[in-house]
Amino acid sequence: MAFSGALTITDLDDFLTPSQACIIPVRNNKKPAEDEGPTEIHIDSNNNYYEVSTYPSVGHDDDIGNSKKALEKAEINLNDCLACSGCITSTESLLITMQSQNEILEFIKTNPTVVDPESPCHKPRLPILSISPQTLASLSAAYATASSRPPIPLLVLLRRIRAFLSQPEKGSWRVWDTTFARHMSLRESVVEFHERKDKKEKGKAAEMPMLASACPGWVCYAEKAQGDMLPLLSAARSSQGIIGALAKSWYGHKLQHKPDEIYHVTAMPCYDKKLEASRSDFYSSLYSTRDVDCVLTTGELDLLLQELGFDPHVPIANESTPSYSATEDSPFPELLTHEGSSSGSYLQTIIHDVQRSHPNPTRIITREIRGSTDNIEYLIQDTITGQVVFKGAKVYGFRNLQNLVRKVAKETGIGRSGRGAGAGKLSAAVAARRRKAKTAAPAATSATTSAEGTDVESIASLSLVSGEDKKLDFVEVMACPGGCVNGGGQMKPTVPTPSAPEAMEVDEEGYQRPLPDDGVAVAVNGGSNNVGTGTVAGMEEGMRWSTKEWVAKVEDIYWTGLPTPPASPPLTASNVNGFAPQVKTNGTTNGQVNNGVDRNLQSDQLAEEIIHEVCGDDASKRWDFMRTRFRKVESDVLSSGGVTHEAVKW
């Protein structure tokens, strides 16, 4: 099982032998009495523990049992484990074995499909499965590779899975996708961004830049190792957090089901989502249930479907007919598209909002940091004044994430306990480079104004120079290289088994020694495998479970397999799927919306209706329904020795 790199390397090495023994001592805050003598621990027949004094009490010389006291039971739950910097790094499988396809199979066997006449008050739990679009894209790529057939469009695959799992013998599941929940998450991110921006403009202390928090691996790392930066994290719930609230709080209420009468499962691209679902903010103490009862990775969903006998290539009726409004099968519009990235499009959504609200025309200028497509800065420039009005970034992968932490710490002063000896020289060198670039700026400006047309490269160069001093406003952060389509729980490329002797590595003595590969060795689209070398053609460092070619294939299916794909996945200056005011749409045919923009407008209206039904005018309820909180983890192991997470050197 593969947790994100941000999670697995935090605060402890991975050289521990896997064990279920907890390294955190269980403390009792009750101080012992000064006159207490020696005691013993006795266990009765019911496994209750008692503390018994070994000396008779005064007035009871012959009775030792009169001082027996029942001991409080010590418990360690999953939240305690998440607050620990120990076994989670070496025994992840022990932590998440309860969330797997085996639990779903057991639920299908034990959950009654009809109400028992002898106990009519006991309702069968309503099963709901919410599938992420990244999961659908990965499954489609795997099915296409295994069968040598064209990839199955995401809408078709979603409906085939729904038709299969809705059968009574399979559990009578309601199967949704999570794109509407993502739509609500994006809307809330825009609202929160404006709140922070308004505070900053009013001269108040604002938590900027705003850092996306949809990636649980990044959140876990921030809570454990970068606690001072938690105020910068967006409080908007992720798509999983919102779909869980929708299933238990809104949909269940409409069907007159209590939250504990719904069994909600999500299928996500990474294992870290299992940890997100266990957070206390997503738990109802009133009904003793979580918003998401079980999280399956893409690979686990595939195993579940295999166990149940699913054939992805069996067609069903009306499987490719678009249906943009809510239906009996899904209370939300299916597979909404949000242009930008396959990791949620958080940055693109903010960019669209900034462009739409700015009074003058703007252009977007991008810059790859060190030539990496996983670390890109985006500048929005006013084309009239030349001012850079927004600076954002897309940061994927733990190496880039660490650089982001240092950059944000430098810009904000957050979490900077000290500076190294070479920090001053480095800052001086950067400042000198900026001054040199600025002195050359007037000549470039005059050249562009005197020539006919627009020198795009010169304008971009000038904008980058002016953007050097501009601080970041928003960052889309993901722990996995390549983003969510390359999550650790996604389907892996098929590993060819070398059978011919010439396909194996030969050592100095002539013996065949196929060395184990550190990662997945696969050739995609005609590529070649380097068997036994430990590397794969096209593999980027950090992509331990996949290759660039495989991720590109899943990415392509993600965009082309949607019912109404945008013009192109990359960021553009046009607002194709931006959020617009709540207005009635007129572009309908037979009651159905006919384009992506109108679908999102319709989704805006539905989102507002849902929020009003659940929360009314209560701002506190709305906050709890749409947002979450983050908590700095104080490690008992490190802090007890006087060492903090921030002081650990790697």
Curated annotation (Swiss-Prot):
It comes from Cryptococcus neoformans var. neoformans serotype D (strain B-3501A). Disulfide bonds: none annotated. InterPro entries: Cytosolic_Fe-S_CAF (IPR050340), Fe_hydrogenase (IPR009016), Fe_hydrogenase_lsu_C (IPR004108). It comes from the Eukaryota. The lineage of its organism: Eukaryota, Fungi, Dikarya, Basidiomycota, Agaricomycotina. GO terms for biological process: iron-sulfur cluster assembly. GO terms for molecular function: 4 iron, 4 sulfur cluster binding; iron-sulfur cluster binding; metal ion binding. Belongs to the NARF family. The gene is NAR1. [4Fe-4S] cluster 2 binds at residues 215, 270, 480, 484. Signal peptide: none annotated. Component of the cytosolic Fe/S protein assembly machinery. Required for maturation of extramitochondrial Fe/S proteins. May play a role in the transfer of pre-assembled Fe/S clusters to target apoproteins. This is Cytosolic Fe-S cluster assembly factor NAR1. The keyword Transmembrane helix does not apply.
